[in-house]
Amino acid sequence: MIEFAKTNDKNELSSLWQMTFLEDSKVIEYFFNNVLKDVVTPVIKIDGEIASSLFLLPCKIGEYKGMCVYCAMTKYSHRGKGYMKELLDFSYNYCLEKGFDFLFLVPAEESLFDYYEKCGFNEFGISRRIILDATIPENKERLNYQYKIDFDSSIIDYWKNCCVVYGGEITDFGLVSRDDETVIRNAKGDFIEIPQDYKKEKTIIQGDISFGEEYTPAMIRTENKELLELDCYIGITLE
């Protein structure tokens, strides 16, 4: 039976998260202390213990409201029993009941695309982008043809914290670099870590044209066909 996690489920959820994703304990602790209050956490319990769970993060795509599936996880001993599909169906129906338009996720690995398709999701291409200054005309033009997938501030702060834990840097502009996904500019205007593909275009980058784009195949479940046609990006706009 599906229920919503309670405060006393924190330790069990934390252990399942670490076991499933080998996540740093600092990241998990930050999430539970600063983000959990803003998310919905459906769980399936078997014999009083959590067998499967996921987090639902509120988000928006333009005027459309929805939820993002995060940390979908099932104990090894309970995999293959259909629990995650039950949770995903429950989550989608929950979205509809609350008046939301979609349920969104980014599969952790390529092998999961077929699985999520069977659960009613469609592939939904997005790009990861960092816009250094949205007030500059060229950047505004770049933003006009795409919809930003936006999250609550507590969730954004959590992802910033993740980058710090895994070796990124926070600047006064508020965003970080992690691996080659993003680039940042510090408070003095100096660039920190420019991806190889963009090094030849440093003059363009210094002109504040948006950059740091990377196509990410995501998936979305929705009754709204217009959403399937949107060109979207996920990232932070530094204004």
Regions found by a protein language model. Give the residues of each.
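A conserved beta-strand-loop-helix scaffold within acyl/acetyltransferase catalytic domains
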Residues: 4, 10-73, 159-199
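Short coil/turn motifs at secondary-structure junctions
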Residues: 59-61, 77, 110-112
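Conserved acetyl-CoA-binding loop-helix of GNAT-fold acetyltransferases
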Residues: 74, 80-93
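Conserved GNAT acetyl-CoA-binding A-motif
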Residues: 95-108, 202-206
